[in-house]
Amino acid sequence: MQLCAFVFLEDISGELPPYEETYLSVPMDPPMREAYRELEDEIRKALKAHRGNRSVLSIMLNTLLVYPDHPYGLGTLYGKEFDPELKRTVRFVIAEPRDLAEDGVYSKERKLVEEIKKELAEGRRCQIFAVYTTKHDVTARLRRILDNEGIRTAVLRASVDTSKREAWYARQVKDGIQVVICHPKLVETGLDLLDFPTILFYESGYSLHTLRQASRRSWRIGQRRPVRVKFLCYEGTMQTSCLRLMGKKLLVALTMEGKFAGEGLQSIDEDDDMLSAMARELVERNGIGETADAVWKALNLEHQKLFPTTSVRTDDAPFSEESIFHAQDDPAGLVGGAFDTAPILVFGRRPELPSGRRRRAKATVPEQASWFGLQ
């Protein structure tokens, strides 16, 4: 390989379609709000009674994030602590969440259906991300709700081998699937979801790396449609706190990477431990700093500055059965103009040789080129 170009998205953003992130906060239905506040109060009392106990912190984080999306079947919640008298670890009750109707469709789910129908009406397939996929399987619940609405839906499971996931997506598109649901970690690297220009984070999780990778799966070389990323959460819940703190950490991370100069370096120590930050908010009954909406608006604004999309095609016509997946633009065309006639190696392809020109049996250049002429 004589020439290889490593480019960042900002280097080719002029050739990419617009990218937009939207934060959607949904108020809870009255029965759920009452049950959630009840659970929140019980966990708050446990946090105060067992200060610094990591088992209570872990229960707090996971339970308050998943309960609004799966408000049944959680059972009694237990913490653990060492009893000096018994000289062993003992369990204690933290809370007993109230079970709501399993067959009900709640406000955030209704909002999700509304957003998906809106996107499908524009001919845009949707990718949904949810992080609770095992014991309290939110993905299966969402699929059932979408199936009942007549929306053709598939769920990507971890059982599909990494090397076969691209082919799995191609099959779903060919079979007429309109929505795919999966954990964001399953697609965070190595997949270009060009057929799914709309991404909905039904649950974000609290891994900044996973969120950053998964949110860009559609915004890649070869994408021809504007990309929309939407984050859904229940208003005034741990989901809101999590998204807001994730947004602040992302602002700090981008600032440290030199992507842009923004506020936030002073808040690294304050919000670096998300678990402690969310526990503090719960105990003190108030948010810390800006609202989640304000943080994500700031992120979106900085993104527009960082990735100006001035020379892009924004055709947003409905998709046909002949998918973009099978007819992508040649990625080399987007960067080819920046170089001379030297061939560019595109991943997965060999550079074409002019007709009549023989391939050399052995390269005459050293294995690794030297920038300074040193051997």
Language-model features, listed with the residues they occupy:
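Long amphipathic alpha-helical segments
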Residues: 34-37
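Short, polar/flexible loop-turn hinges at active-site or ligand-entry regions and domain interfaces
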Residues: 43-51
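A conserved SF2-helicase RecA2
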Residues: 206-215, 219-308
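A residue-level signal for conserved active-site and pocket-lining positions in enzyme catalytic cores
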Residues: 1, 64, 246
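Conserved RecA-like P-loop NTPase helicase motor core
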Residues: 152-245, 249
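C-terminal accessory regions of helicase/translocase ATPases
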Residues: 123-127, 141, 151, 276-375
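Conserved P-loop NTPase motor "coupling/switch" region that bridges the ATPase
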Residues: 1-8, 223-226
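Conserved Helicase C-terminal RecA-like lobe
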Residues: 14-32, 50-180, 185-191, 262-264, ...
